[in-house]
């Protein structure tokens, strides 16, 4: 007599009791057998479902109803099971003991459970499969032993489990396949041995599992397979060998004639041999990406008529497209990260049912015609070497919805390349070399990406893309055509189209919503309603225009425009005048006047850059979006940016040098009562020019930050590199102003009262002090702006930032010459000398300057406080001028030994 018959006989008294009591037990009778703190409910079949999970139980509950069909004891603290604790539960079909502390299950623990179909023992501390406790559970269909510490499976532990369909042994410590234990599981259909430590699968490891359909062996340490390890698996359809240490292709799979899904990705397989799947005609899906595959036989995937998906990622050494003859059902093909340089012309003849083609990250240069692949819905060809898209490449692909051609070298696209793609919704052409884009056939696009095509500078009309929702452009100005530059999107309203509509008209239009006179009115109304919906959901275009990239004007506000024009005019005229008077009027140029002249020259460069920006604003007035991209990428923009930074830094460096020169001059005059030239002036000037040029060239070397905005200046926000550059400039200039301040503070501290007025050339000392004060004051807003950006302080409005960059920064270029013209007496003297020279040169162009009357020369020398003296000896003697209240002049001797030089005493 078998066990099931015994179970029926043992339950017969219970059945007789039920019959005597009038049939099925009442709900009240069932619930009286519910343990304390557990939740019980009828299952609709005269039986009881008992849930005692997560109650902290340390032992099995008592007083369980004999009619219990479902018992959940998971997530408790049960550490051991007594013999036959549940023998009376003859109707129990599902027992859950997961998440407890069981380390051992004794024999007889499940005795009497003749109806048990599901047993869950996962997440315990079992170190081996119970040797005898599971035997003779003839009704058991599902057994979960996963997430334990099982390292041993006794040979006879599964004997008697003739109905077992599903077995979980994953996430344990198995090191080998328990071949003997599996021989009694002839009805097993699904088994997982994943997440163990198995190294090898021997021959005939699953020999008696003829009904097995699913086998998971992933995440083990399998490095070798027996050539006949899968023999006997006549019904196997899914085999998972992913995430192992396989070094060779598993040729043992050729015996699996019914295999439909095969995965062996993330291994160390280096090659796939010819006719690798010759014994697997039923294969539908193959996953073998993330293997260091170097060689794939051309016939490896031939004659797989059921194959639907083929995925091969990261096969970096594949150079030829595989031969797919006889694999006509393929719907998805992914071959990425290889070195395929060309596709066969017959690729679509072999794959007429292809729907998804992913050949990204290859070396494709030329493309065949895909017109035969009528079912293609998605093509991904990004990151290749494609140069040209011909007219027939994508012709008549009526089902194509997504086309990705990003990160290629595409410079030419035939005007009709997209003309027969009515279903195309997503097109990605970003990061190519396009200068224009055809629009024929693209009316149905909803997503368009063109970013990274720096040669594509023209505007694209929004009328060509009526269904567009998302678009990415190379330049922000191109988004102006899609209305993103407006602050508020104005929704066209069919009830208020006219500004002069009367109340009666509005009433008629309102009534027209509910009463449509004829079909024509209905069509017009629907068209207007569709326009309103489109207005409610405008196109999302990026990068969007902003306060520094406007659609209509370069400067934006008239305050900035007038300020830039004023600075440009004053800087050019005043600095030109100062430069002329310094370098053309004087017979001899002292060190300080040379520095003043050079400051005027570099300030004139700043005026040139401001004038160019003002000219661009005037030329593009009202239509800057049409020229913004061209201007940003033009060489002129980079030249303007370079000149601005070079002029600004040179001016600061020269002013620093002038302050040091004045301090040196005053020190020498106080000590020797004579003026001594500043040492190594030419070398210092060359160093200043070199340093300023280097500072101005940094944005060019670091990726042309000058082209980041149409203002052609590094913006003190956004990219960390630009912010760091601006902060570095501010710190450098602040250091210069600190040096100047210290030098002049020492100068004034060492002078006694009245000494400054009695000094030679005191006007130049005062002039440099005035320049220092003015430039330092104007430097403060720039420094505040840069450090605010560094600290992410966002309370400064964009208009204020633009005003600082365009007006405050170049303002010293016009104030410096104005201060010299208005307050320095040397200018009037030099201007008079320049006028006399001009008058003289006009009267006598061929007469030498030496013919000037000696009296005029002497008078000019006195008026300009300059005299030309040639020293031919080491001892220098001259008369010093006396000031009011000072003793008469007396001769002085300079202790410095000099060669013959021109020297100008102070007056």
Curated annotation (Swiss-Prot):
Name of the protein in its database record: Leucine-rich repeat-containing G-protein coupled receptor 5
Gene symbol of the encoding locus: LGR5
One MF term in the entry's GO annotations: transmembrane signaling receptor activity
Extracellular side: 22-553, 615-638, 704-723, 789-802
Domain LRRNT: 33-64
UniProt keyword Transmembrane helix present: yes
Disulfide bonds: 34-40, 38-52, 348-373, 479-541, 637-712
Broad class of the protein's primary localization: membrane
Organism annotation: Bos taurus (Bovine)
Subunit structure: Identified in a complex composed of RNF43, LGR5 and RSPO1. Also interacts with other R-spondin ligands, including RSPO2, RSPO3 and RSPO4.
Keyword annotations from UniProtKB, A to Z: Cell membrane, Disulfide bond, G-protein coupled receptor, Glycoprotein, Golgi apparatus, Leucine-rich repeat, Membrane, Receptor, Repeat, Signal, Transducer, Transmembrane, Transmembrane helix
Signal sequence region: 1-21
All ranges on the Cytoplasmic side of the membrane: 575-593, 660-682, 745-767, 824-907
Described purpose of this protein according to its UniProt entry: Receptor for R-spondins that potentiates the canonical Wnt signaling pathway and acts as a stem cell marker of the intestinal epithelium and the hair follicle. Upon binding to R-spondins (RSPO1, RSPO2, RSPO3 or RSPO4), associates with phosphorylated LRP6 and frizzled receptors that are activated by extracellular Wnt receptors, triggering the canonical Wnt signaling pathway to increase expression of target genes. In contrast to classical G-protein coupled receptors, does not activate heterotrimeric G-proteins to transduce the signal.
